[in-house]
């Protein structure tokens, strides 16, 4: 059973609050970040997270669910083609709210809500066997690396010789002047 939210609503009526949250979510997906009040940022965050979670799997049902909230087809396309696939390995926490101080006119606390674009760091291995396997693959990768710098050093050797020759020529030119 739906329960009313406690305290004052954003914009006055529940319908106006829903419209405000829809517009904030749309602008967030279109621009990547939105500067708004802390209260609005905290209220739009769960809605944005829910929509991004739906956008991770591109199905007709998920597109219809998102279209109920965001009516602009261009923004829905951005959500499903850019933002959703980028969050594929992440299990929540798609947005970040950062406080930026107070607004000059009315001293309202302001915040920036943004879609996180950082890559997901690989998780730590769960067991000791996984840790050993990860270490083994890392050492194999390090053993393969020295071959490439040897080729680079051979390619850079003629360049270094040319630079030394140029320095010798410069020193020879300086001696007659002194």
Swiss-Prot record:
It comes from the Bacteria. InterPro entries: Ribosomal_bL17, Ribosomal_bL17_sf. Residues 123-139, 151-160 have a biased composition (Low complexity). GO terms for cellular component: cytosolic large ribosomal subunit. Disulfide bonds: none annotated. One of its GO terms (biological process) is translation. GO terms for molecular function: structural constituent of ribosome. The keyword Zinc does not apply. Residues 161-178 have a biased composition (Basic and acidic residues). Keywords: Ribonucleoprotein, Ribosomal protein. Residues 123-178 are annotated as: Disordered. SUPFAM superfamilies: Prokaryotic ribosomal protein L17. Belongs to the bacterial ribosomal protein bL17 family. Part of the 50S ribosomal subunit. Contacts protein L32. This is Large ribosomal subunit protein bL17. It comes from Cutibacterium acnes (strain DSM 16379 / KPA171202) (Propionibacterium acnes).
